[in-house]
Every structure is written in structure tokens, then in C-alpha cells.
From Swiss-Prot:
Species this protein is from: Cypripedium calceolus (Yellow lady's slipper)
Family note: Belongs to the intron maturase 2 family. MatK subfamily.
GO CC terms of this entry: chloroplast
Subcellular location: Plastid, Chloroplast
Protein's UniProt name: Maturase K
GO biological process, one term: mRNA processing
Physiological role: Usually encoded in the trnK tRNA gene intron. Probably assists in splicing its own and other chloroplast group II introns.
Amino acid sequence: MYVNGRILRILKFKKDGFRQQNFLYPLLLQEYIYSLAHDHNFNSFFFYKPVEIFGYDNKSSLVLVKRLITRMYQQNSLISSVNYSNQKGFWGHKNFFFSNFYSQMVSEGFGVILEIPFSSQLVSSLEEKKIPKSQNLRSIHSIFPFLEDKFLHLNYVSDLLIPHPIHLEILVQILQCWIKDVPSLHLLRLLFHEYHYFNSLITSKKSIYAFSRIKKRFLWFLYNSYVYECEYLFHFLRKQSSYLRSTSSGVFLERTHFYVKIEHLIVVCCNSFHRILCFLKDPFMHYVRYQGKAILASKGTLILMKKWKFHLVNFWQSYLHFWSQPYRIHIKQLYNYSFSFLGYFSSVLENHLVVRNQMLENSFLINIMTKKLDTIAPVISLIGSLSKAQFCTVLGHPISKPIWTDLSDSDILDRFCRICRNLCRYHSGSSKKKVLYRIKYILRFSCARTLARKHKSTVRTFMRRLGSGLLEEFFMEEEVLSLIFLQKIPFPLHGSHRDRIWYLDIIHINDLVDHS
């Protein structure tokens, strides 16, 4: 979780009674909370024009926040505005627009407040375990060296999908374990109702586009807390079923409500719970997750993996009330199966090498088997993403980008080169470089078609007039930081470079749709 330095300084100097009793609701009336939310997340059109809309010099004054919370609780005005908006259209009624703006503004500030107890406990746990922040590898590519080191000795792999909550009240119950402030929980339920109501009401493409541009810090926090609840069950079973202490499970905070459920489970099942844990013992169990997809690999047998699947699904559904679909959890043998994870198709390849050894007059053959984790960039999904972003057709034929023809030539070149560089950089760990060459070819000629369309010319005439040096940035070599040797080595995207390179500065996967 991202730790805000200014929030921690606020906690250090704020010694109010509500903070000591975990009362978060009064923080909603503090102006600096909304300035923090504005600095971090609000980069949309809502906060570029709030002064003209509301007529306030301060965008989030104390009086405004009080009025926002008061009007959110007035259900009659909301219902009347909805009925009127159905007649006049969505943008025809200001009260309806403002009511959504109220909930959006308060929810983002509420998201900043909810992170305060989590951030303080996370920092204290890091200080107790003496874990330097510089040693926390945030790069996504740092996962692949871990897979190369561990997965070569495993037998089975199971790809999981994080189950879906069957009701929004489950999210409130998750946060109820951490927050003892009743008004904050009531406000949380109200925000859930607002989001559910607006999502079901807004159906036009313009409205969806407008509200989808908002970066919802509040919703990201809820999703992370929900995923943490799902993962905590796995780590609890893993810790209880192993004699050894887990060394790669990361940092997890203390929970109380979960142990109450486990105690109730032990009372119901009597001694069968410990018998179940005995059947789940496996010292070579590895778990990796990114967003909503996870990989569970083991050196055990197929029966052991099926037991883990059975107990995880039943615990999720029976005791945590999470809806899970068992048929979507696939268990495959690692040597005969390629799993999709983090934009790669990964599999373990076996290479056999026959060596002839001769001792005196006797000679014999030695069969040496080596294993290697093979990662391949999925060409079909990449072309599908480029097709959705209108860079090519479904078959991979480059097309022009009409919405970029109003930009300058330098901006068009910069956008195409940046997308090409990001894609080739992220998929630099692919063992088959032909996929990168094809992606680069699509973006290069899509850029040429876009420039030719802007200047009302053909691609051949345009390229002949300006020369081949126009698109030379697509072929420029890039200096990369080697993961093994801390030195810079040239990485030619167009050359015969066969080695896989993992970067240490890629912290998220960029969606191509965001560039359009």
C-alpha cells in the first residue's frame, strides 16, 4: 500500500481524542484531507472547473464539505432529481450532476482517511522487521527471476481467479474489523449505495466516459482490502499446515475478526480441522498474484493440489461468503502446460543433452536434462489490444489513427514511439523476438499512415518526400540495466539479441486504451 508522508506527519502532530479511539469520521471535516486527495488523484475535468460551478474560492472548504455530507443523506432530493433527469436527460439537471459530484468528492477524501490506520500499522511493522524500503522490489519484472529460480523444481501449477463478493455489505464487514467508528461505517454504506445507483443509471457512452476518467482512490483501497481478505485465508492455512516458517509471504497485519471465525470453525469441526491441515502440508508451495489473477505452484502430487483447491473454495464460500467458481481453477502439470500471467505465456522446457564419456577402454553415454522457464509474448492478445486502440485491424494490418491527425508531427511521432518503446520494453523477456518485430512493424506503418493522412498524401509519396530517417526512432538502440550485472548494455530492438532482459523500474502494466 502506498504510504503518504504527509498523512504520517499529520498523524504525528494530531493528538486528538477521536484519533486515539480510531474515530475517523471527524477527519472528513478537515480541509487538508481533500487537498491531499486532490494532489494525488484528481486530475480530471471535475476539479478543473469547480470554482465556476460552486462559486467558492476554496475548492474544498469546511462549509462545503459539511453541505456535501448533509445533502448526500437527503434521499428525497436525490430521487426527485433522478425522476427529473429521466425526462430532461442526464446533463439537463444540475442537482443530479452535483449529487454525483458530492459523493465522488467525499468518497475520495474518505479513501485517504481509511488509509491512515493501515499506513501507520504498515510502517510500524516494517520498522519492527527492519525491512528497508529500498529492498522492496516494486518492479513487475522482478517476479520472473523468482519464477525462474523456483518453478523449475515444481510439478503442478494452478491458476486462480480472486472470487467475487456476492454483496457490497461484505466489503463493509471486512473494514469493520479495522474500523470501530460507527458513523464512518454508515457513510461507507451510503457511498456504496451511491456508486451502485449511478452505475446502474448511467447508460450513455458520454456519461460513462466522463465518469470513467476519475481515478477512484476509494475504490482501489476497497479492492486491495478485499484481495487481502482472500489471500489471508491462504496464508493462514499455509502457516498452520507447515512446520517451517514462511519466508516469502510478505508483510501482513494483525487480524482479530478472522481468528474468531477460525475458532468457531474449530468448535464446529472439533478435531477435524487439524486433520485437514495435516493433509495440506507441503514445504514447496509458492504463491504469486497480480491484480485479480494468482498462480499457486507445488512440488506435491495432483491429489494435494486438488485438496488445496477444494478447501480454498469451501472456506471462501462458507466462512467468508465469497462467491468462487471451482471450474475456473485449472490444475495442470507444469511441464505440459503453459500458463498466462503478467502478459506472458510461461512454461517449463526440458532440454536433453547426450554426452559421450570415455574412461580407458570403456565408453558410455550420459543423458543430461536441463530445465528452463520459457516466456513468450502472446501475439494474438497484443494484436487484439492494438486493434482495440485502432492501430491495426483484427488481422494485424496497420491502419491510420484519425483522432491524432489534429496533433503536430512531433507529437504524433512521440506518441507512437513511446507506445512502441513501452511494449518492446515490457516484453523484452520474451524468448521469441519475432513478436516484438511484428508489433514494431504495425506501429511504424500506423504512424506513417497517420502522418500521410494528416498531410493528405499516400504513404509511399510521404515517405519518399521526407526520407527514411523520419521513423528512425523506432530502430534506435536502448540502454538497459542488466539485472545480473549492474552495468548498461545495448539492447537493439531490430538486431539479433536473443537474451531475455527484465527491468527493475516497471511498476504497472500500461493499457493501450489510455493512450488513445
